[in-house]
Every structure is written in structure tokens, then in C-alpha cells.
A protein has these predicted regions:
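Short amphipathic recognition helices of helix-turn-helix/homeodomain-type DNA-binding modules
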Residues: 67-75
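DNA major-groove recognition helix of helix-turn-helix/homeodomain DNA-binding modules
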Residues: 49-68
Length: 75
């Protein structure tokens, strides 16, 4: 489902916005720390390969549940 994006700060913010999640909530869902999500959103670091897989799985799940719409988010 998730392909490639170079704009992880916008992607993470949009996922949180659509799902009405705080950074802490998203961190819990992805199994990472609040600080990690915060650094992704602020563009300080890019998600690791493992984190990208976690984001992919989370997005696939929430899209399947009809809670998330990804059109326009992926390149």
C-alpha cells in the first residue's frame, strides 16, 4: 500500500490529523517513542526501514477500516 515519499513530516502530520491522534498516541500505535514521532514531524530524522514498515502496516490497517484516506499523500 505505502509506496515512497520524501516528505515524512507532512505524511506523519496528515496521518495524525485524519485519525485525530496525538504524537504520543501515534507513537504507541507504531511501537516507537513520542520523541521519535516528534523528530519525524520536525524533519530532524527520517524513519528507519523498520519504522517505514510499521507506518506501512498501520496505514494499511486504518485504510482497511475506512479511517484513513491516503490519496495525495504518496508519490
Amino acid at each position: 500500500m505505502v509506496t515512497k515519499t520524501n516528505n515524512y513530516p507532512s505524511l506523519v502530520k496528515e496521518i495524525r490529523k485524519q485519525l485525530d491522534l496525538s504524537q504520543e498516541d501515534l507513537a504507541r500505535e507504531l511501537g516507537v517513542s513520542f520523541a521519535t514521532v516528534n523528530r519525524w514531524e520536525n524533519g530532524q530524522v527520517r524513519p528507519s526501514k523498520l519504522a517505514k514498515a510499521q507506518i506501512n502496516a498501520f496505514c494499511s490497517k486504518t485504510v482497511g477500516e475506512g479511517r484513513l484516506k491516503l490519496s495525495g499523500l504518496w508519490r
